[in-house]
Amino acid sequence: MASLDENADELHRMDSSDEASINDDQEDILDTPRTRVRKMLASVDMQLSSNAVSEASLDKESTVGNLENQKNRSYSSEIYLHSDTNFLSNFDSAYERVRRLLNQQGGKSSLQKKEVEQIETQEGGDNAKGSPSSENKDSDRNSRLQQLIEKKRNALKKEQEDLIQNSATSHSKSDNLDSESADDSDLADESELSKKYTSDRKIRNASKKALLELHRNTARLTRETALKPEVVVKKKVTLREFFQKIGFKNDNQLENKAISEEEANSTEPPNVEKEEPKPSVDRSTGIVNSEDIKELSVEDDSLELKEITPEALDIGQTSLFTTLNQTQVKKEDNKKFLLKEINAKLNEDDIDSELEIEVKPKTTALDNIEKSKLSEENEHGIKGKLKQLAEIKLSKDGKPFENEFNIKSFNRNLVKRAAVMAKLQRNQLEEELKAKGIYKPTIQGEKEEEEDPLERARNDAEKIRQLEKASGNASDEGELNDEEEVISSSNTPSTKAKTTNKVIISDVIIEATQAEPKRRQKNSRVVFDEEDLTGDSHGSSNMKISESDDESNGDMIRDSFDRLSSESIKDSQKTEELHDSFGINDEVDQSTSLYVQNSQPSASQLTIVDATYSQPPPRWESSSRDDKTNTSSTQPSQVDSLVPTQLDSTIPTQIDSVQRNKDQDDEEILEERRESRRDSKTFLSRTMLYNKDTGKADSAWASDLIEEQAIESDDEYAGIGGLSDDGLSDSDAELEVQNMIDDETTIQKGEVASMAQFAKDQEMDRDEKLVKQLMKDVTTGALRKRNRNGFAALDDSDDEDYSNLRREKLKELRRQKLLEDGNLNVLEGDKRKAFLATVEDSLVSSKDNLTWLDATVEDSGVGSSDLGDEYLYSEQSLNHEEEEQMEEELSEIFSSGGPNVVDRVYLKKSSTRHTSDNNSLEEVLPIFPGVRKLVSNSQSEKIGDLSNDNSMGAKSYKTPIISSTQRPQGRKFRGLMNQSSKADISRTVDAGSIKVVPNSQSANPPRLLASLNNYSDFD
């Protein structure tokens, strides 16, 4: 019975637990996934904390037995097994804990389902056998309950064992690999269980929040691991090994330094004693031997620091200098480094209360090295290096060559370099000009000039003009200037005339350097022959030069080149100086003129002057000329049309005989100049005359060509311009032209003056009217109101706007006059709409077209404004009954007018009553013009026949028609008002109101258009 009671209690407990689980499941359905996870974790933590001890002691013996069977199990793993659940619950992440719990629950539920299925199958089998008795049923129930309880307990025990084994195996893997073989069976069971769990339960996908939390945890773990990196030292490198690799110090020095460092780092610093011998110090390095350092000792209580040795201050300099100067520096054993005395002084001066540190000044190994005398070999080596830097060639013995410096080769090299530089500059300039489209090669330019004779003639004329200008600016000797001209050729005219007066230094130098230097040189003179002059009309005179063997020619060419380079910058010299270089000036001697002539290129060929050309001696007669010439020294060269690097031809004239012969007397200089002048006359005049004749022939040919072209052009247009000029003389043609041209006007001077006076008078009248109108507008306030919208700003278009405004006013007046006609009923109908529109929209250009608008006395008070026209009148005897009657009649008109008519009579009701009571304000009655087809003659007469008993007399009033845009307030009318025959109405301003005062005097009624000029105040 007791067992039955226990079974019943257990069943009741299970039922209650099932109900609680059902309720919990219902609550879990309503909860969010996050709250479910929190609840599960809280329940698991509570169970683990409460049952930790009982679960640990439940199967202690079995776990201990299993642990003994395992090999190489450490004590730390045993301790971990007792607290595995706590460790897992506290240190695992939330994701791992939830997954583990879900797996456990899934495993339990699957086991329970299997047990229930087995029981049902057994019951089904028992039922199939037959229906047992009641006692058998009770016994069967008890047995089933016991079996279920035992199975449950066994399952729980097995789960606990599995957890313990899993934790043990996970930790034992890192300690021992043999433990894995012992737990193969347990792992196999675990894998089978996990397979069952996964097959029975479907894994739910993690939510976004769970994934986000998982990523955060992983990021936190990675940050923590990154903050604590693991430092691994692969290999330690000592200072000695480092210096050995770079080969900086010897092994002995490194050993001594290592020992000194050990002593410095030791706890007991060395002490200094005066009685002991001085330690030996290596003079080259300044390092104290280790044995001597060990002997030093210092008291334990002293705070004195170790002496800072020169080695500590030296950063590798001592060893560097010692290795470089080992061969030159001699070691001296007598000099030693007194380390003990320095340390002793530091100890004596030390004070117990304060710490004083004295640092020895920095010294280097150079202070300890004595300067040794340089040997002759070293001295000779230094001199050799200096000579090598100066680019002085040395022989094998180290001595320079006998010919240290050759002036001829030096000058030749200098000239070559200058020629190359000039050539490069010229090429660069040619490329720039080609890129701009200005430069044309010589061959191309010649072809174009041959094809275009007009261009060629123009160039020839330009040359002639240049020559004439140069001849006019020459010196006082007229005969010489008339005969001598610039050497030029006619077969290759340049595209620019200025190029004929320039010297191409680069071509001269390049071709001068091409001469053979070893050839024996002779004195040369340029000789012109008649055959050379007359042989080729278009060819240039080939100058022949013979070489001289004077050794002083290098000095002359060097001096001339220096002068060329110094004077090349002066570009502002006039062109007249160009002709002084050709012998035109009297002060140029024979040799200078010859040198300049040889350096001056012709139009087609350039005659070469050798760089070794020497100056002819003074008093050199023409009889000593050598007709034998060396033709090999002349080399023709084509001259380009554009010369980039050009120097003024006046530069060679600086080589004057006075500068070259400073030691000579004045008489010799004058005599030499006379001879040179005589030679230049006989030498250059023939050439110049020949060139002058050829230039005249070219100019004559060009003029003939131009005349032929002009005749051809006249023939093309023959017969078009009337009679030909062949039958008329020059005088007849001039008379005819004079008759065609009339320089004087046919109008007489009096007529012109009268016309000018008339125009002037008109202009004066117009200006006077404008000024008067402006003054009137200023006095009446019209100018202020006119510029009201422009904020009192002056504008050029004010007058134009004002004229447009007056035009609109006239247009409105015309429309009102048309509406007053009684025959407007004829114009009713759709057929007349176009006509009415044209009448209404037509513009009135001037008031001359409105003469028919002139009104009588009845039209007094009609005005115009920018918002429309207004009809102003006043009645002193108008009572309220007449006013009401008139309002009723007007209301009938407005009611029949349609939606376009707006009744504003009632807006003015209060103002009209006020004016009728006071009898002081003018009354304004607005009637809109949109009802023109409804206003008939009878209605207008009915409305207009308003009588005035007092002052106005028996008088008929027209219908006051006012613009629809007029404001309902009272208008201020400052224009000229029409007056009746009995009374003259004038305006006076009294306290802001307008009074109408009758006058006994009568005046002629003004015309309507005249009154429009006085309308200046329009709101």
UniProtKB/Swiss-Prot annotation:
GO terms for biological process: mitotic DNA replication checkpoint signaling; mitotic DNA replication initiation; mitotic G2 DNA damage checkpoint signaling; mitotic intra-S DNA damage checkpoint signaling; replication fork arrest at mating type locus; replication fork arrest at rDNA repeats; replication fork arrest at tRNA locus. The keyword Phosphoprotein applies. Phosphorylated by rad3 and tel1. Keywords: DNA replication, Nucleus, Phosphoprotein. InterPro entries: Claspin, Repl_chkpnt_MRC1_dom. It is found in: Nucleus. The modification Phosphoserine is found at S604. It comes from the Eukaryota. Residues 17-30, 177-191, 476-486 have a biased composition (Acidic residues). Residues 487-503, 590-607, 630-658 have a biased composition (Polar residues). The modification Phosphothreonine is found at T645. GO terms for cellular component: chromatin; nucleus; replication fork protection complex. Residues 1-33, 105-143, 166-202, 261-290, 443-683, 965-1019 are annotated as: Disordered. Changing S599A: Severe hydroxyurea (HU) sensitivity. Residues 192-202, 271-281, 454-468, 556-580, 671-681 have a biased composition (Basic and acidic residues). Interacts with cds1. This is Mediator of replication checkpoint protein 1.
